[in-house]
Amino acid sequence: MIVALMGCAVGPSFEEYLTTVKSAGGTNAQDCGVGRRSESDKIALACASDALAQNRSFIAVFERRGIDSQVFASVVGNERGELWRISWDSDVTGGAGGNPWPKRRIFRTVCERAWSDAIAKCINS
């Protein structure tokens, strides 16, 4: 008997990624929503920029254009003015479906708040 396992991904799921983002923002973080490369990007960006200017905790999630995988980048800020980019890649191996075990990964980076367009630069860093 031969048993084949195909399509088993390794690493954190998208749901686990969202849990990580929400946890980083804290219980009182304003949820600015998910921007999906459209008008919702502008709404989430405006919400996050407003929260940052008022030193409020927030989370904003943005879908990015991946070459061969699904990619999301979140900006998370807290009351102390700290700012992070937390991103998720559905397959860091660049397998484009060729790898039977895609490797999902979460990355966390500190962003500079000094920029006037800190949120946009953080998302695209």
Could you describe each region identified by the protein language model?
Residues 13-34, 94-96, 122-124:
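Acidic (Asp/Glu-rich) sequence patches and key acidic residues
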Residues 9-10:
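Bacterial signal peptide processing site
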Residues 59-65, 87:
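Short beta-strand segments that buttress and anchor functional surface loops
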Residues 20-61:
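N-terminal secretory signal peptides
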Residues 69-125:
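Polybasic, proline/glycine-rich intrinsically disordered low-complexity segments
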Residues 13, 36-38, 52, 116-117, ...:
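Mature cores of small secreted peptide/protein domains
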Residues 1-6:
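Sec-dependent bacterial lipoprotein signal peptides
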